[in-house]
Amino acid sequence: MNPRGLFQDFNPSKFLIYTCLLLFSVLLPLRLDGIIQWSYWAVFAPIWLWKLLVVAGASVGAGVWARNPRYRTEGEACVEFKAMLIAVGIHLLLLMFEVLVCDRVERGTHFWLLVFMPLFFVSPVSVAACVWGFRHDRSLELEILCSVNILQFIFIALKLDRIIHWPWLVVFVPLWILMSFLCLVVLYYIVWSLLFLRSLDVVAEQRRTHVTMAISWITIVVPLLTFEVLLVHRLDGHNTFSYVSIFVPLWLSLLTLMATTFRRKGGNHWWFGIRRDFCQFLLEIFPFLREYGNISYDLHHEDSEDAEETSVPEAPKIAPIFGKKARVVITQSPGKYVPPPPKLNIDMPD
């Protein structure tokens, strides 16, 4: 295990998002099942923490950008700063939606269409952000997720306001289409990993990478699809499972996503104005971490040494025997040498 390589590819932004979503997905089913009686404002505490860190990081980054004009010429600093501003705008719209959801659940005074209005604005903004991101080679997971789900947001709002009376299985048709695409992605990675495993021209590192990607996608998509199916059947009244048991597959998907952040390069360097990789930033603040970060562990080293020590010594080579009459070379098998039988003399009577 190499901690240095592990943390150099660490993506702190996605790790923060998945951690907050995991905590929220734990608190929400506990509240829905009545195990805890907290206010929904408290249940949404991980979401508030997520948005607070986003706003604080963008504010500090904007301050560093304004006070240090010389930083604007460093590599792709301008592109990363614009990407940070776009992400903050999307997060602020999501924050408005979450505040309206909590207010609607606690007081119940306005329509759900009004609650979902920020999401209706998020989708076109996300489409524009995706176009800009593809041109500048930026990571766009959140933007793509918001842009493709506009129809799903409309259906859910209409269903909650009882304008349409479809079953939840039909309401989530846009989600089923999206999950079908994700299942095709999983199938694609499985096929390619099998092809790489059977190919002899591929190095072991590439095989390992494709197999890891296939396992990761399976562990993310299959539990997520299971969670959605169980939730839809629970909302339609086809089962009486507790919400805690329904959310268990979602926890597995989020834990897998958290694990993938340690091998996922990326992240904007302008959050909190650090202007460098998160690993380098931590090593500068905490120098004692360098001692641990420069250590690598080889768990198979001792086993290989023991195997070399206990290896069977090579059998001594035995010189070939030349047959004079047949003029052939008889090679004896090493380790299986059998001495010739003694010469037998038979005395014949006169």
From Swiss-Prot:
The chain crosses the membrane at residues 16-36, 41-61, 81-101, 111-131, 168-188, 211-231, 240-260. It is found in: Membrane. Its main location: membrane. Disulfide bonds: none annotated. GO terms for cellular component: membrane. Keywords: Membrane, Transmembrane, Transmembrane helix. The keyword Kinase does not apply. It comes from the Eukaryota. It is a multi-pass membrane protein. Belongs to the TMEM185 family. This is Transmembrane protein 185B. It comes from Homo sapiens.
